[in-house]
Structure formats: C-alpha cells, structure tokens
Amino acid sequence: MMEELLPAETSSFPGPIPTQSVSSDEFTPPPQTVRQKQVEARIKELGDRLARHQGVSRRAFFKTAAGMAAAFVAMNDVYGPIFGASLAEAQNPDLANERAKALSGQFIMDMHTHFLRDDTRLQNFVRSREAVGKAGWNPALAGKPQTLEDLKFANYFKEIYFDSDTKVALISGSGSEEPRDWFLTNEMKAEARAKVNKLTGSQRLMSHAIFMPGMPGWLEAVDKAIAELKPDSFKGYTVGDNTNKQLSKHPWRMDDEKLLYPFYEKLAKAGLVNVCVHKGLYNLSTSQKFPHLLNHADVRDVGKAAKDWPQLNFIIYHSAFRFTGGEGKNGLAQFEQTGRVDWVTDLAEIPAKYGVTNVYGDLGQIFAQSTVAEPRLCAAMMGMLVKGLGADHVVWGTDAIWTGAPQWQIEAMRRLEIPEDMQKQHGFPALGPADGPTKRMIFGENSARLYKFDAKRRAELTTDRIALAKADYEREGPKRTNLR
C-alpha cells in the first residue's frame, strides 16, 4: 500500500522557503546573513498580516500557495526584482491556488536526489538539521532532535513525490574508502528503484551506480553493475572519497587516458552514455584543509574527456559551483568584480573552447545554495550556464533530501528571472515564464532526452498509483518540509 511508504509527520512547517543556508554533507551551516534576517522578518510580517486577513493561522498560511508567493515577495523586497511574485497573489488565495494548480502537472525530472541506508552511521547529516533548530532559524526544529529516520527511504519517498511537483527522480549516492560510509550501495539503489517502480506501475525512479576509479577491483565492480544492476547511469567523484576527504587515496581526472578511458569504453559498449561527475562544492576553507584534492574539484579535466568521447554525455553535478558553506558572498563579489564565478564560468566556456556539444550542467547545490543566500549570484550563474552550455544542456537536480522537500526550489526556479541590468551587461538570455520553453527544458525535457524517457512513459505518470494517492494526500492538506 502507498500509505506504508509515508512516515508520520513529525514536525510543523515553519515557512514556505528557507531563510538560511544549511549544510548538506559538504560543510557546516553558516550563520544567517543580515539580508537573510531581513527576509525572515519580512516573511513573518507578511505572514502575520495576510494570515489575519484570510482568517487562518500564520503556520496554516505558510502551507498555502499564497504563503509561498508571500515568501518570494519578501525576497524581492530585500534583494530587488528577481522573482516573479506579486502582493496580489499573496493576498488572494484563489489566485495563488489557480497558479499552483496550473503548474502542478509540469513535467519535472529531478536527477539528483539522495537518501541514506538503514544502517548508516553518518550522523553529520542529522547534526546539520539540528544546527538549524539550535540557531533558532527554523522554529519547527527548535528543541527537537532530528534522527536518521528523516534521511531514509520512507521520508525520501514522501518529500520527493508527495510534497513536491517532482514526477521522476534519480537516486544518487556517494562512495567511500570506508565501505560503511557509502550513502547506499549500488545494490541498494537498484533495489529502491525496483521497489518504487513495482509499487507505482510506472517508471518513477531511476538509479545511479557509483564508480570509484583506482580502488581495488573497481572495473570489475563496473562490469558487475552493468550486467546485474543495469543502472540508468554511472556517477563518480573526482576527489575520490567525498564523504571522508581525510581518507581519500584515489582522486582521479576525467581525462586520464590510462585510468578512465577503459571505463568510458565499457559504458559506450553497454549503451550507458550518461556519465555523471560531481564537481565543485570545494570552498576556500575546504581547499585549505584538503589542498591535495583541490585540483581534482575543478573542471580543467572535462573538456578533453568530452572531446575524446563524443558518443558520451558528461553531466557535471552542481555545475562545479565552488562557494558553498556561507561563501556565496565571495562568489557574488567575484562576479561583480570580474564577471566570472569559480568554476561555473569555466564549465560554461567548455563548449566554445573545445568545440563539444556533450557537456551538461546539473544544478544541484548551485541552485539550493545560491537561491537563498545570494539570489543575484543565482541569477548570474543561471545566465552563464544557459548562455554557454545552452538551455538544452542544463538539467534539473536539487540534491534533496539533504535540503528537505524540493518544492521551494521548484517554485524559485519557476519564478526566477535574470535582472535586466545583468542581461544587458553580460548578454545573458532571459529565463522566461514558469512554463516557458527554457524552464521546461531545464525541468524535464533535457533529462527526458538524455535518458530516453518517452511520451508513453510520461503519460503513464498521470494515472499511476502515485498520481492517485497524491490526489488524496493533497485533499488532506500539504505537509511539506522545505528545509535548507
């Protein structure tokens, strides 16, 4: 039964969007910035006023489409007109609900999601959620211990499929020199995919197999995964062990002909043409702590590999965004001074520099981090990627559920526009309306093309068991967990 996959709700919903950057596995949560405090205060002010006017509690208001609109109005009040949101929408529940309903069927493939294995010991993910409560930024978590259960399959299923407009997801993972610290084994990811798709009667979940070049027996593990698990694509981390960087003994380069090219040959032969590679998320403090891995975190090895293997697609996760963990201000300062952002600009320039058309940018934490911390930086990076890679080479991914239910990111993307001054100065194209061609490509059409998710499969999603169960779930009222 579908209900068996839904956990009991354990916390109330504090606000429509997060008002502070919170960690994934990459960094500890930074303190709120002055502007983030201003946004939070403005959201609370609007929430109090509009909730009273509509005759509901502020908490109830924040669970509505009008509450979501109010949050982006507050963002615009602080950061300037970056998001498409109006006070009229926030004041009129019918108008907000009509917009939300019209967009709810939008085809969204989130090809960058996570949950943790049942026997995980990675308590750092729990500590990151608790830190938010201790800091007082998220009332729902204040004084309430978080548990690893919040990061396991049942809550993943709920937050991805019921608390957001996501239609299809890909379960990713991360390997480690320490076997116990793999987020999920490759077998576990394949089992989750089979479980969900059998339950729903459609293809709602895809899965990665993680490859770890240089590890003993790694190519044999690739052969086994191809033969037995049939992953939808492979994913690797060029820094090696990203979870325990202090243990990383096998960093690698994408253009290492001796080490990687035999792997690419296996993928091409098997028809698994999508190679997903984690890049970036290597801020200045991490660089100082682990300098030996720094040269593996950027994108200097992408161009040659892409040129040498035109039959493969290289999808760079997080679009190589460097400035995580409260360092978004450094990224914005760099952009304002130079027009560049490490290492997103470098990635966006690869097609022109190398004459290739097989390099893609996954959003992941590039969007989750910058949307809340520095919206103008977010707009700038989206402009770079769409201009350099092409709108048909940028793919949606949220890194959920480290970031809670991804609906707030979906709404941010729907409403985001590159400011006119930025468009004129840098030649960035406009992103256009929520359901316009550019955002449709990014949300789902590009990944559908990459993974051959055809019209028949898309049609099945409208009448499968999730579609039916979600209709009942929404009638009972939303219970999103839009954490950051």
Task: List each model region and its residues.
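Divalent metal-dependent hydrolysis catalytic cores, especially in the metallo-beta-lactamase
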Residues: 130-149, 155-181, 204-210, 232-233, ...
